[in-house]
Amino acid sequence: LYDQTDWRYRTEPSCGTVAVTPCFGTIGTAPGSSVRNPGPQTDNSSFYQDTWRQTKQLAFFASVDYDLIPKVLTVTLGTRHFKFDNSAAGSVTSSFGCYGVAATPQGCFNPNYSYNLNAQNLSDSESGFKSRGNVTWHITPDVMVYYTYSQGFRPGGFNQNGGSLHATGPDGLPQFANPSSYQSDELTNNEIGWKTELFSHRLQWNGALYQENWDNVQIAFFNPGVTGNIFFNTNGQNFRIRGIETSIVARVMDGLTLQASGAWNHSEQTNEPALIDNVPGSVNFGKAITEVCDGAGQNCSPVGSPFGPKGSPSANAPPLQYNIRARYEWSVGGYQSFVQAGVSHTAHSYTQAGANPTLAQAGLTTSRLRFELEPYTLVEASVGVAKGNLNASLYVENLGNSKASTFTSTDQFIVEETPLRPRTIGVTFGCKF
């Protein structure tokens, strides 16, 4: 996978072969790096990354079903072996460190602010087994209960700014080196559920109770005041998620169908990791970073753990969601008609699982703030008619014109919100061929 991204917004003039400030040297790629466009970039390039990433995956799986009691009690066992070989290389170049630098045939590449990924030897391998077990019991032909145990994971990867030093301590030395890579995180699921069809199949009721353990969770950091002005990923929290979900479909009478589904879950951080001083020789090496100072080790300011305290909820995880819908269909004079209405609700959630503040404060070191997303309710309705291969419908979405943000971020130093779609009224026409 190749990635070439060029941020062309520099307005200062470029330096010539003899630098006369104010000017910037034209940035170039890391010497000897594996890039597709080597050498100097455009005169207005402020940042440029020319990288590639390769993942080789080998996997095989097996699954066996065995009827302990034919058509009544079945056991399923399965496993998957995986092997990932990951590697990355290339150049990530910044115009920092290029102010007043004379032009050269190779372009300006300052290793204090830019990164030669080839020199970091970014390669690793992961392998192992992830398995699944299931027991299914058909109490009757229309009532089934089950238990499932399953495992999953998300592969790790590399950071483009690995090894860069930040967070000066009271001894004047950096306390944190950005990690070159991050590991996979893992999910273990235990679930008990049921599936039923009752009252001559006029009522369908399904549901499940579950507990998920999500460990070594991958998390992205962007904290210019502590860990530099480039995103990097690492591993941190463990979460336990417990919940219940259910759905009902009821054919109340000919033509009338009611549907409802809902889920409640409680997510909780079960550990309390910290950002650890990982620079040998620094005064607090191996301990949690609790303060950041100026370059001389003076004027220190306290910093908290960005991972958040034990008991915090996971990100973007509303504790309650539900929807209810009713649909009535009938026929008159060869026309198939319907009317439908529904309501859905999403409870509040948080944009991050960490401990970042919800409002900008004096001395704040990060632009990645934590926001609470307000709960919202949506109402929709539609009516339609069809005959032969033609159909038409009238619909309205977000009937109450609810206003809420589905995601809020300050990563770009301004508050950005993704709003709900406003009330929308429309007409559709269709023809089947």
Regions inferred by a protein language model and the residue ranges of each:
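Membrane-embedded beta-barrel scaffold of Gram-negative outer-membrane proteins
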Residues: 138, 144-154, 161, 174, ...
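Hydrophobic, lipid-facing positions within transmembrane beta-strands of outer-membrane proteins
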Residues: 56-64, 129-135, 178, 188-192, ...
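Transmembrane beta-barrel strands of outer-membrane/channel proteins
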Residues: 1-4, 77-83, 145-151, 194, ...
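Outer-membrane beta-barrel channels and translocator barrels
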Residues: 69-73, 140, 187, 199-201, ...
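Gram-negative outer-membrane beta-barrel transporters
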Residues: 208-213, 232-354, 428-432
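Residue-level signature of outer-membrane beta-barrel architecture
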Residues: 62, 66-68, 127, 135-139, ...
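C-terminal beta-signal and adjacent terminal beta-strands/loops
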Residues: 255, 333, 343-361, 384-433
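Solvent-exposed loop segments that connect transmembrane elements
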Residues: 10-50, 86-124, 157-181, 219-235, ...
